[in-house]
Amino acid sequence: MLKMNQKFDYENNKIEDKNIILELTRNYIRNYGPDLLAKNNSAPVSGKVVGEEEAINLVEASLDLWLTSGRFNKKFEKEMAILLNTRYFLSCNSGSSANLLAISALCSDQLGDNKLKEGDEVITCATGFPTTINPIIQNRLVPVFIDAKIPSYNIKTNLIEKALTNKTKAIMIAHALGNPFDLDKIKKIATD
């Protein structure tokens, strides 16, 4: 068992070591970060943007041994709840998980007559990712595929109204390759 002064030394050493590691991380990103980015001068359709602050938070979370939903995630969820003016906010590990949670929640018995039921149609984009389409199928709903515009690969909003039937209960689409779809038009179709 640690004595009081040993515990104090342990905590002080832990904090000092952590600060050294974080300072080394800052120096590494400042000195070598631009070189790491310059090696790949192409413009990828997706990827990561990691600056000094993100690198520090990543290393600090690793030192806390919280690699998923630790204090940084709790802070993020609190700030998002405030930003969205909602009581709760729950983050997901990926957009794939978020899509599955969203569709599954819409199939919940807690929604009563408003829940999505087996066989209900869900409009989606023909060029959608499997992670947008799979939750529809997993919940025994019927995807109705709408063609996409080239070169954005987003849904052709003018075709949505033509696809509506009495079995259409939802629209589930994702922005394609960072290109936002016409949200205002989709909202208008959904609320009319």
Residue ranges of predicted features:
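N-terminal "arm"/small-domain region of PLP-dependent enzymes with the aminotransferase-like
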Residues: L2-L67
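PLP-dependent aminotransferase class I/II
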Residues: N27, K48, K74-K78, N85-F89, ...
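Generic alpha-helical secondary structure signal
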Residues: E53-L58, R71, K75, T131
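Acidic active-site catalytic centers that drive phospho-/nucleotidyl reactions
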Residues: E54, E77, D147-K149
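Solvent-exposed, non-membrane alpha-helical residues enriched in polar/charged side chains
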Residues: V59, L63, E77-A81, I103-S104, ...
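Conserved donor sugar-nucleotide recognition element shared by glycan-biosynthetic enzymes
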Residues: S69-N73, G95-N99, G128-F129, Y153, ...
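Phosphate-binding glycine-rich loop
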Residues: R71-E121, N134-N139, F145
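PLP-dependent aminotransferase-like
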Residues: S108-D192
